[in-house]
Amino acid sequence: MTDRWDRYFLDLALRSAAMSKDPRTQVGAVLVGPDREVRGTGFNGFPRGIADTAERLNDRDLKLRLMVHAERNVILNCARVGIPTKGCTLYFAATDHTGNVWGGAPCCACAIEIVQAGIATVVSPPFKIAPSHWREDIEFAGTVLAEADVGYRELT
């Protein structure tokens, strides 16, 4: 894809992120097929049917136990309705409570699910501004993607 298309799909990922009710970090993902068709979207949030209460969202430990990451959500959303993910490109982007936009490889758990879903490429904003507490996990996830021959690129 061209930078123009990549930017368009990253913008859609950021729009999806805006749907998240997480008060600290909003992450969005868009899955795109080989013909530039959007196959699905996702954002970080609680599972269907689980109430997004202020108590749960503001209790970090509880929130992290309930939260479905955006990358996983888009894969599950596609699986739920039978949309193929094999050979697709996953775009994801995050914003934090200060308005910074960041990216990098997904977390390791999401990277493994991306590999298992047959996704061919991951595109995100630059790694350099990802929160420090995610750095080690993001670096290892990049290794997982590379070893599994999943393309990864950052769009600056």
Task: Please provide the spans of the model-predicted regions.
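Short, basic/aromatic recognition patches
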Residues: 1-25
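Zn2+-dependent cytidine deaminase-like catalytic core
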Residues: 3-4, 40-155
